[in-house]
From Swiss-Prot:
Residues 267-349 form the PUA domain. The keyword Nucleotide-binding applies. It comes from Xanthomonas axonopodis pv. citri (strain 306). The gene is proB. The keyword Iron does not apply. It is an enzyme of class 2 (transferase). This is Glutamate 5-kinase. Belongs to the glutamate 5-kinase family. Pathway: Amino-acid biosynthesis; L-proline biosynthesis; L-glutamate 5-semialdehyde from L-glutamate: step 1/2.
Length: 363
């Protein structure tokens, strides 16, 4: 899995630069020639769109203008990658809902698997044209980590515009030293990451470490490297790492539990009492309506939600995530009741559990 940010593809004068993409394409070609399968997660559609309509962000609403630029630039982005390869390049656009909904998540996995079987090179991007801003995945680092787990990748390579992870921000601290090997993403390591990186993209070093943590939970190592350095990219093509290696977690969680833990969450939560909290975290129990104190948001049956312990603020600690068997409206009506009362209260029942333990992961 290779993730390429827009800052590595954007030309100084606007649009996309084939010169910067060439080295990364050579890295891809070397891996393909070695018989490896590879998936690319590539940003750059909005940057490409700005070259077509440079004043779009000045005259339109920020969200609508960005979505329009993404629509204009996505074709340019795919064309950029296609020019480097003889094999077909497949465009795959994903949204928050595609990863949150279990059926669509599995369908995306099947599609990507078939593309790889057919010898195509999938190039994935978030579908900015239709993504609702408050439900956006946020950055392609996060998307790359989830897709890496989706396709059961062996490694996640994240191309950056610096040489990897440093002990401090090298742009502002001359004493910053590069870290070649990170056995574990401790709080101290996470604190080394600064804020945003280039002003072209949306992801800084912090998001890259968060992506590495998500990939690591699926047993996938992450490599951060300087995608602008031809020397570094050529070394990588020869399997000689020049950058930062971040080890996978010692214990790999099961595929379904990974999805429950890391898939995007609907804007909603189920509030539970102390007894239910103890049952979930200590006994691995399902969540029954008797332990439910209420619901936040307007989620539907089958949505992924957070499960929070109720406190005096009404918005307590998030203890778990899971797929709700009932809508927020239904949960408010059956909260605190016995499971046998569900059908009498609602007029129907989807079972005794609000969230079944097989559809739940404790954080």
């Amino acid at each position: 899995m290779l993730k390429v940010g827009s800052s590595l593809l954007a030309a100084d004068g606007g649009g996309l630069s084939p010169r910067f993409a060439l080295g990364l394409a050579q890295f891809v070609s070397a891996n393909l020639a070695a018989g490896r399968e590879l998936v690319i997660v590539s940003s750059g559609a909005v940057a490409a769109g700005r070259a077509i309509l440079p004043k779009a962000m000045d005259v339109g609403a920020p969200i609508a203008a960005r979505q329009a630029l993404a629509a204009l630039g996505q074709a340019q982005l795919i064309a950029l990658w296609q020019r480097f390869f003889e094999r077909p390049v497949a465009q795959v656009l994903l949204t928050h809902d595609d990863l949150r909904n279990r059926r669509r998540y599995l369908n995306a996995r099947a599609t990507l698997g078939e593309l790889l079987r057919l010898g195509a090179l999938p190039v994935i991007n978030e579908n900015d044209t239709v993504s609702v801003d408050e439900l956006k995945l946020g950055d392609n680092d996060n998307l790359a980590a989830i897709v890496a787990a989706l396709v059961d990748a062996d490694a996640l390579f994240i191309a950056t515009d610096i040489d990897g992870l440093y002990s401090a921000d090298p742009r502002s601290n001359p004493l910053a030293r590069p870290l070649d090997d990170v056995p574990e993403l401790t709080p101290e390591v996470l604190a080394m990451a600064g804020g945003s990186g280039s002003n072209v993209g949306t992801g800084g070093m912090r998001t890259k470490l968060e992506a590495a943590a998500k990939a690591g939970a699926a047993g996938i190592e992450t490599y951060l490297f300087n995608g602008r350095s031809g020397e570094v990219v050529r070394a990588l093509a020869l399997d000689r790492l020049r950058g930062t290696r971040i080890h996978a977690a010692r214990t790999r969680i099961a595929a379904r539990k990974y999805w429950l833990r890391h898939a995007p969450v609907e804007a909603g939560a189920i509030l539970i009492d102390d007894g239910a909290a103890a049952a979930l975290t200590g006994k691995g129990a399902s969540l029954l309506p008797g332990g439910v104190a209420g619901a936040q948001g307007d989620f539907r049956r089958g949505d992924m939600v957070e499960i929070r312990r109720r406190d005096t603020t009404g918005d307590g600690q998030c203890l778990a995530r899971g797929v709700s068997q009932y809508s927020a409206l239904d949960i408010r009506r059956i909260a605190g009741r016995h499971s046998r009362e569900i059908e009498n209260v609602l007029g129907y029942s989807y079972g005794e559990n609000v969230v079944h333990r097989d559809d739940l992961v404790v954080l």
